[in-house]
């Protein structure tokens, strides 16, 4: 097995810089398909948080069994975002064109999911944090240094806010990443990984130890800075950008997909032995970046993976919409079917194991159905209609041209 980096002359033909005006590289079906697999732990973690099992041992076992795999998936999505956007950036693109595509990729789905969440909250009689909901509408909630401020409405949209911050910076970041000499790309990747590792260290050293979070043995500000702060998460996106350039410049090591996947497992297991904040992304980010690049190379070289099959790609295409609807369905759906005590407070309903599992499966199926509707009824039409400016009609020719 070859483990030395490619020299530029060894780069696969499909990865050579394209002619001006051409899309830079082939579609990466495997990176679309893996989105769905990465989303499953997020769904299951949020389902575990609902505590639907009446057997406390089973309920806590479910939550403990999920460990930090949901956090790892979120880190993967940030790395993936930086990689794919860099990979697909067109030579003829401008910052305005890029921002326009991102705007109509994110906000139509977000606004529909926001309204859907508000309707569910009203139906469930859930309390509104007005300032939190306004910040969430504009995807600004992750800038507020308090996880409890983020924990309202459709809580998962904090990551969209981090994405939007990265998109705003992307043209500048891309210009900087493109200036890195190919021979130095791996050094820069290593330096960025050190930054990701330094973030929890900085949080634990500089930020106050209280008020404390209910999990992890850390304070709210420490948790926010490491996990939610958009600029902290942007570092993972930039790692994805650098790995895309490593592949495109022919500096990739010949790491098979299976080996990269094994490293992800090893990285995850290793992370569980470390303090809470280091589990979130500091340890998993390296194997996740390696897996992303190895899948991209497999697709670009025509080897592909099962993740690039039609069904997996279809599921991956639904993943963004699924991500936006699943948490309100789990959280407020649970409230809707739970009783209230004499004081009007919700008493979360629990079930035996078969009924609880059935409920989770139903929530998954409903989320998938709504994701399909949103993807086909909102996301795709919005992208077709508004993601690119309409071409101006050609000016009419001279009056006698038609007759000629």
Residue spans of the language-model regions?
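Alpha-helical transmembrane segments of multi-pass membrane proteins
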Residues: 42-53, 200-201
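Transmembrane alpha-helical segments and their boundary/interface "anchor" motifs
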Residues: 31-35, 69-75, 87-121, 131-135, ...
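C-terminal "closing" transmembrane helix and its immediate cytosolic amphipathic cap
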Residues: 1-22, 312, 327-404
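Functional transmembrane helices that form membrane-embedded active or gating regions
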Residues: 23-40, 99, 106-107, 160, ...
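Central hydrophobic cores of alpha-helical transmembrane segments in multi-pass inner-membrane proteins
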Residues: 76-84
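Hydrophobic transmembrane alpha-helices
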Residues: 83-90, 170-178, 240-248, 289-301, ...
